[in-house]
């Protein structure tokens, strides 16, 4: 049962993450260190942390699950990196859209108001415009062909999806960036299963307290990430919601 959470007990609150971890546990956690999320009647009378550093897991009644250890990049660092890359893709896409809007250049003399009036009338939807006989549309209007903008926008969309997929995969979340009109086969959907599972398993050090719990009570608990089970649970939850809607409707 999850009792609650411990707030920053193992960390020194240093700005630099690499020097933030406290390797010397000065205090064994007790009931006063836990922010409980369970009802009061489920809170034990006494709480003492189980850990091999103190008495080789011979006493205590709760463990603390930790985030990834510092020899890996933290989730925040990964998210910040991909946030910068996604912002770059979004900015490039905005730049392409602006390029598509500016498709014509009108040549004229400096301070020539007639050409300004022409541009204003054209973009305001005037059915016809009056110009001087000296105006030559072939010579005075330069067409900036933007045929490459649409394919570039498609590539920007695909790159954005790829970055989102990379971020999800690095966090151990199964994600597929394939964009196909014909749909995605089951084999394609599972093609990155090994990569996401390996990234999920970098949390194994954070699961080490489970071994303390097993040693304390003589159990054999082996946690692992099961992507298929996670998907099935999501499907069952969706099905349950649909059935509830049908009954209530």
From Swiss-Prot:
Chief place of localization: virion
Pfam families: Phage_connector
Subcellular location: Virion
GO cellular component terms, semicolon-separated: viral capsid
Keywords noted in UniProt: Capsid protein, Late protein, RNA-binding, Viral capsid assembly, Viral genome ejection through host cell envelope, Viral genome packaging, Viral penetration into host cytoplasm, Viral release from host cell, Viral short tail ejection system, Virion, Virus entry into host cell
Recorded superkingdom: Viruses
GO molecular function: RNA binding
Protein name (database record): Portal protein
